[in-house]
Amino acid sequence: MRKTKMTLLCVLLGLFQGMVLPSCETNRGELIPYLEFDIYLLLYADLADLGIGGTKLIDGGVNGIVIYRESDLEFHAYDRTCTMWPEHDAAVTEDPTFFGVFECPVCGSTYLLMNGGEPNSGPARYPLVEYSTSLNGDVLRIFN
């Protein structure tokens, strides 16, 4: 009888750890508020000066959006909110010495846009939030 109670206690403790401890991890998606928006940009007007590997800052999202042009027809759009401390409400800014590297002015985390917005250095563990993009003819749509 005593062995059965001990086994039951171990099983319940294991289930408790399996359910509660992973929930202590903060989900990146919960850090940055979800906003619904649609932004339309003309490829040959609004983005004419955006070469491959280049970036352009636009209004939108939580703290602004940075557009990264990966190839002729492939674009990525990232929210400029640092995923380490989004409550600081400070937008990441482009590192003047490296193309496609953005740095948080609060925590010093750097993000590589050519690597999916992944953190490169600093305390941030999650990539910048990426918004959906689609190119239809000469119109780039950024949406969430």
Q: Over which residues does each language-model region extend?
A:
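Sec-dependent bacterial lipoprotein signal peptides
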Residues: M1-C24
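Extracellular secreted precursors and ectodomains with disulfide-bonded cysteine-rich loops/domains
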Residues: P22, R80, F102-P105
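N-terminal pre-ligand scaffold of iron-sulfur
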Residues: E25-T97, L112-L113, V129-N144
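Short cysteine/histidine-rich metal-coordination sites, predominantly Zn2+-binding motifs
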Residues: P96-V106, E118-Y131
